[in-house]
A protein has these predicted regions:
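Internal nucleotide-binding/catalytic subdomain
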Residues: 157-166
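ATP-dependent adenylation/nucleotidyltransferase module used to activate substrates
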Residues: 1-157
Length: 166
């Protein structure tokens, strides 16, 4: 009996990550959903109180797809790695893209590391991008098939190690 490859998928509660899960399940992978809790500010609670929390959406989606779900509270790491850098850059007169901080340091830095420590073979998201395994053993990041939806630019700072487990 073949052992299934295990993939942890970062789930936002949106369509893209749900489709990624569904495609991986169709291909025969064992899948676990993972969501990172990044922000909870009481000042905004009154504004968004009628909206479901992103972690609730992600867990509901995981349950509907019949996969295990993990919620990681990474608020402090997110604040240090993303929010503070964003504010520093913004106050220095630049307009940063927070995804460029978040993806290598948080999504792949924390979530992927957690997934691999739990025995996962791979870590996936719903980003529109592709990777290619080269004969040299390196991995190359490629644009998404639909160039109008391409998100490879926000993954451009991922390391070879991070890409190789994606």
């Amino acid at each position: 009996m073949d052992v299934k490859q295990h993939v942890f998928v970062a789930m936002s509660g949106g369509v893209d990550s749900a489709v990624a899960v569904a495609k991986l399940l169709e291909q025969g992978y064992a899948v676990t959903g993972i969501h990172m809790q990044t922000w909870k500010d009481p000042k905004w609670q009154a504004v968004i109180e009628d909206l479901p929390a992103p972690e609730e959406l992600a867990e509901t989606t995981a349950n509907a797809l019949g996969i295990p779900f993990v919620l990681l509270d990474i608020r402090e790491a997110f604040y240090q790695s993303v929010v503070q850098k964003f504010l520093h850059e913004y106050l220095s007169g630049r307009t940063p893209n927070p995804c460029l901080f978040c993806n290598p340091q948080v999504k792949w830095g924390i979530l992927q590391a957690y997934a691999l420590a739990q025995g996962a073979n791979y870590f996936a998201t719903g980003h529109y991008a592709r990777i290619e395994q080269l004969s040299s053993g390196k991995v190359r990041l490629l644009r998404g098939v639909d160039r109008f939806k391409d998100q490879s630019y926000v993954l451009s700072l991922l390391s070879q190690s991070q890409l190789s487990h994606s």
